[in-house]
Structures are given as structure tokens and as C-alpha cells.
Amino acid sequence: MRGLLQRVRGARVEVAGEVVGAIDQGLLVLVAVEPEDSREQADKLLHKLLNYRVFSDEQGKMNLSLKDVGGGLLLVSQFTLAADTRNGMRPSFSTAAPPALGAELFDYLLQQAKAQHADVASGRFGADMQVHLVNDGPVTFMLQI
């Protein structure tokens, strides 16, 4: 499971012109499910997202987590993050989970996030989405579980 974490001042996701998820300060995370993933990987990714220290403390040091600052968490499914780009001029998606597994694990991740954190929003799995964000920093990390 992969998560592209971006610290944002605000972000929203639209589907067909309708806002389906939005947060103020927090983390926008693009999530890719891979074929061998299970709920265990989803749990580990969520733990890292909630506790990864990417927000600045009073001294300007990245020392605070999403939980510490009470920020929002916007989860967006993005199977293209699992692409194999090592060869050729066209990405291969054989390294991405089948849609049914991707949907199941993304939904599980979302439900667990909502159970463990107050401010959680998401895009719509499998939809053509427009993601709007204001990067903060920018601070971006690729997490692979």
C-alpha cells in the first residue's frame, strides 16, 4: 500500500462539479492499493498518517503529528501510484490491486480513519476526480507499507 502524503493548508475533491470531500489544514493523502495488500497494511498506513510528525512546533521543527494539531485528513484513491514505470514510455498497472480489492481496502482505511480521527473526508473510489489543494511548504512524502 502506498500513500503520497501532502501537508496542506486546505484541500477539496470534486466529482462532476460537486465537492465530495474537503478539509482545512491537514493532510491530503493519495492512496494506492497493491495486489498483496490486506487490512494489516491499511492499519499500518493509517497509524503512520495519524502519527507522522510533519507539522512544525514552536521552534519550526517538524515535530507534531496530525493528531497533535487536530488537522483534517483527506483520503483520495489513486491506483496510478502503484504503476510500474521502470520500462518503456507507458506505465504498467499490473502492480495495482484489482478494483474490487482496491475498493474494499480503501473503504476499510476510510472507515478506520473515521473511527480514530475527528476530521476525515474522502474522494469517491473509481470516480474521475478533480483535486484542489494549497500545499503547505511544500511538504510531501511517499509512504510505502
Swiss-Prot record:
InterPro entries: Daa-tRNA_deacyls_DTD, DTD-like_sf. Its EC number is 3.1.1.96. It comes from the Bacteria. Disulfide bonds: none annotated. A motif (Gly-cisPro motif, important for rejection of L-amino acids) lies at residues 137-138. One of its GO terms (molecular function) is tRNA binding. The keyword Signal does not apply. Its main location: cytoplasm. One of its GO terms (cellular component) is cytoplasm. It is found in: Cytoplasm. It catalyses: glycyl-tRNA(Ala) + H2O = tRNA(Ala) + glycine + H(+); a D-aminoacyl-tRNA + H2O = a tRNA + a D-alpha-amino acid + H(+). Keywords: Cytoplasm, Hydrolase, RNA-binding, tRNA-binding. GO terms for biological process: D-amino acid catabolic process. A Gly-cisPro motif from one monomer fits into the active site of the other monomer to allow specific chiral rejection of L-amino acids. HAMAP family: Deacylase_Dtd. An aminoacyl-tRNA editing enzyme that deacylates mischarged D-aminoacyl-tRNAs. Also deacylates mischarged glycyl-tRNA(Ala), protecting cells against glycine mischarging by AlaRS. Acts via tRNA-based rather than protein-based catalysis; rejects L-amino acids rather than detecting D-amino acids in the active site. By recycling D-aminoacyl-tRNA to D-amino acids and free tRNA molecules, this enzyme counteracts the toxicity associated with the formation of D-aminoacyl-tRNA entities in vivo and helps enforce protein L-homochirality. Belongs to the DTD family. Homodimer. This is D-aminoacyl-tRNA deacylase. It comes from Pseudomonas putida (strain ATCC 700007 / DSM 6899 / JCM 31910 / BCRC 17059 / LMG 24140 / F1). The lineage of its organism: Bacteria, Pseudomonadati, Pseudomonadota, Gammaproteobacteria, Pseudomonadales.
